[in-house]
Structure formats: structure tokens, C-alpha cells
């Protein structure tokens, strides 16, 4: 890519304005408060996958997350990650006050599976997935007798479906095959059970279970859980007893916004994690001429290479 003479010089140029890129800028400045830093991102907004959606409904604003949702299991974070949350003003203990963990139980709600008539011969909603005994849940479904038995076996049988393999070999295989393939070829469940789980991943991974690696299911307990791996590969680590409650109304977009507030305070008014959610961000403040730190959007980096003496890096965008 042809390059001309440098137009600007910085102590640090970060390619990508997602949470990682913004964090890199934060830590660099923390180490050197006088550093000149430029963050470049090809999108029209910062945050990367941490997107925020805003809608107007009957004159009222509705906020939701458009990408990454949660600060998952913060107790297990490395010290440097915990330090970052503290630096930008996030107190994870506050989520215990804001999140009503008994809401669904108080309304007598539970996980349920919707069965369609095309696959199962009857259109039926069966409640209690993950909270009732599996024999009882399966009995209420419109599945065939074999499929019911296979569902119960997949959950209850203490079976290693990859016998004779080491843990490393199992993880290697499960990383290469889909969860659907694993259920079909190794757990050997009925086609109706495969179809029951096929669209499970659409709300989380955005693809069907024929495209979700089987290893992703290890220790997965959301929505009542997924069967077949518990006795095949022992889970190491995980959430433990920590609840899945650490998320803002706009998901991790608030993490990105709080990073921007820390880097460029005048861009996002306020001083708390709470007031950041509804504060209006001033995008004109992100890239001010002469500023020591700039976040430059709509800027696609096309080349990065060391100078001849390797004392600097030329970034072309």
C-alpha cells in the first residue's frame, strides 16, 4: 500500500475501538498520563461487538443490547480485569440490588420447549424444562417413545460417550465437531431430539446447533441446560454459584461507554455507572483537533509496518 510522509505522530495507535482497544488506550495512558494516543476504528461507533440499540416507542426511549451482554463471572476475573472495572466506575456488587433474581419464580414462570406439529405431530408447549424430573418432562412431550427415552438417557445416564480417550483428545474432537453431530453420532439420540435442540443456539450463538462446536456446551447451564457431556468431559472452572446478573440495560455497551468517559470525560456527562446508561454521548468530542487522546471512527486501517530503523510504526488508514 503506498504511503506518504507521516501526517501525525502519536505515542500509541490502537487499531480497533472495541472494549479491548479502548482498554489498551486506558492502560497506556494510566502508565503515561502525558502520552498522545489515537484509537482508529472502521465502524461508525466504538465498542466493537458491544453494541447498543435505542428505540423510540410512543415517545419513550427503549434501550437494549445489540451484542455482547454480560460481565460474566467477575469473581473469576484476573486482577488486571478487576482493576479495569474499578477504574471506570463499575461496582459489580450493585447488580445484586438491581437484578430481581426471584422475578420468574414469583410469577410461576419456567423454561419451556415449543414443539411444532410438522416435526412432532402436535403443536405443544411443555413447561418445566430443567426444573422437573426429566422422565416427567419427557412424558408430557409429543415426541415418539424412543425420542422420549433418548432425552431422559442423555440427561440422566452417567455415561462417558468418548471412552478410551484422554481429556485432551476429547477436547480436541469436541472442538472439531458440532453439538448436533455429537448428539447424533456419539450419544445416538433420535432425530426428534436433534430437532428439539437444533435452533437452541440461534438466540445465543446466532447459528443452529449443526454449527456450534460441541465443546461450547461443556458446562452450559443456561435455559435449563444441554445434555450429553456432563460425564464425558469434566468441567473445570465455570460460574460456580455466581449468578448471571452482571449486565447493564445495553449490555457491555456501557462498559465501552464508561471507558470512553474515562478517556474523554467531556464526551459522556455524569459520574456514575448508573447515570452513564441514559447520558447522551457527544460524538463530536471523540476526535478533537490537538487532543492528546482521540477516537477516530470510520477509519479503516489498511497497512501497519515498522519504519526502516524499527524505532516506530507507520499506520496507514
Predicted regions and their residues:
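Extreme N-terminal leader/targeting segments of oxidoreductases
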Residues: 1-12, 30-36, 52-57
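Glycine-rich Rossmann-fold phosphate-binding loop(s) that bind the pyrophosphate
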Residues: 16-20
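Catalytic nucleophile loop
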Residues: 21-22, 78
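Gly/Ala-rich phosphate-binding loop of Rossmann-like dinucleotide-binding domains
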Residues: 25, 29
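Conserved acidic E/D residue at the C-terminus of a beta-strand in Rossmann-like folds
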Residues: 39-44
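Dinucleotide-binding Rossmann-like beta1-alpha1 core, especially the glycine-rich loop
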Residues: 59-150
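Active-site/ligand-binding neighborhood in enzyme catalytic cores
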Residues: 156-299, 310
Amino acid at each position: 500500500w503506498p504511503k506518504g510522509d507521516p501526517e501525525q505522530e502519536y505515542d500509541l495507535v490502537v487499531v480497533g475501538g472495541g472494549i479491548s482497544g479502548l482498554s489498551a488506550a486506558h492502560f497506556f495512558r494510566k502508565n503515561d498520563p502525558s502520552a498522545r494516543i489515537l484509537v482508529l476504528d472502521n465502524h461508525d461507533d466504538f465498542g466493537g461487538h458491544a453494541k447498543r440499540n435505542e428505540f423510540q416507542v410512543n415517545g419513550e426511549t427503549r434501550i437494549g443490547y445489540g451484542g455482547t451482554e454480560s460481565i460474566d463471572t467477575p469473581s473469576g476475573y484476573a486482577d488486571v480485569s478487576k482493576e479495569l472495572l474499578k477504574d471506570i466506575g463499575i461496582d459489580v456488587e450493585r447488580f445484586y440490588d438491581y437484578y430481581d433474581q426471584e422475578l420468574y419464580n414469583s410469577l410461576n414462570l419456567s423454561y419451556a420447549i415449543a414443539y411444532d406439529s410438522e416435526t412432532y405431530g402436535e403443536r405443544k408447549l411443555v413447561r418445566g424444562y430443567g426444573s422437573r424430573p426429566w422422565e416427567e418432562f419427557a412424558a408430557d412431550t409429543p415426541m415418539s417413545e424412543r425420542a422420549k427415552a433418548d432425552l431422559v438417557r442423555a440427561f440422566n445416564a452417567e455415561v462417558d460417550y468418548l471412552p478410551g480417550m484422554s481429556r485432551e483428545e476429547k477436547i480436541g474432537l469436541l472442538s472439531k465437531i458440532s453439538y448436533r453431530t455429537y448428539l447424533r453420532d456419539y450419544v445416538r439420540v433420535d432425530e426428534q431430539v436433534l430437532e428439539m435442540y437444533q435452533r437452541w443456539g440461534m438466540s445465543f450463538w446466532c447459528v443452529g446447533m449443526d454449527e456450534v462446536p460441541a465443546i461450547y456446551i461443556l458446562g452450559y447451564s443456561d435455559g435449563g441446560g444441554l445434555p450429553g457431556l456432563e460425564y464425558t468431559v469434566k468441567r473445570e472452572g465455570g460460574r460456580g454459584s455466581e449468578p448471571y446478573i452482571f449486565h447493564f440495560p445495553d449490555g457491555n455497551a456501557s462498559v465501552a461507554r464508561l471507558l470512553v468517559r474515562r478517556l474523554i470525560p467531556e464526551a459522556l456527562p455524569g459520574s456514575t455507572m448508573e447515570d452513564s446508561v441514559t447520558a447522551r454521548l457527544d460524538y463530536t468530542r471523540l476526535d478533537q483537533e490537538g487532543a492528546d487522546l482521540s477516537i477516530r471512527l470510520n477509519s479503516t486501517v489498511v497497512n501497519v509496518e515498522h519504519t526502516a530503523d524499527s524505532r516506530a510504526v507507520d499506520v496507514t488508514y
